[in-house]
Amino acid sequence: MIRFERVTKGPVRNLSFDLDRGATAKILFDSEDRKNLLFGLLAGLQRPEAGRILFFGEDLFAHEEDERLALFRRVGVVPAHGGLISNLKAWENLLLPAWYHRGLTAEQAERPVAEIFDHLGPSEAGLKRRMGELPGQLSLYERRVVALARAMLMEPDILIYDFTFAGLERDAAQQLMKLTGKFHGRKAGRVSLYLCPDDAVSARLAADSTITLAH
């Protein structure tokens, strides 16, 4: 599903890994700059200097941009800071991709979103009340939850988590770890790739494989 073949870009040198259907993996970083570089490669925003990046068996950069975008409709991304549109309310941010790409209405999204929030325990009620706020009025945790729910509504085959648990209190990080684990198991063959700082919080994240990128 995701394959790197001796990929080189800046400080990332000769990186190779292969994630098959159903895999979970975490990549640990010693610097956010290195993480941002790899995220750009995974998102198709940066072209490698050498090597190949394949999604679903297709070389990303052997395709024109339109074809590459079609591949990424099967890929979800949860940006570290939420990646929310500043002048749209949280609920509007959450719904926009599912409405645009899947034709999902607010009424149709209500049940799956409620199921996602149900896994968040005591914070669920407060989060629901906050869905009418703009992103700038939300906490980091709340922005991450909105970004998670937005990606999950698309039911992607691959989901890439960008420092999703970094900077959160232990209990909040643990809640999101449980949520992503449950979501991974909901669809046969789904791949979950976590980009993580090399710290104690990330050490608690269960994954089939771990890759460490450090100097």
Task: Label every PLM stretch briefly.
Residues 171, 176-198:
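Conserved catalytic loops of ABC-family nucleotide-binding domains
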Residues 95-108, 118-121:
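ABC-type ATPase nucleotide-binding domains, specifically the catalytic core motifs of the NBD
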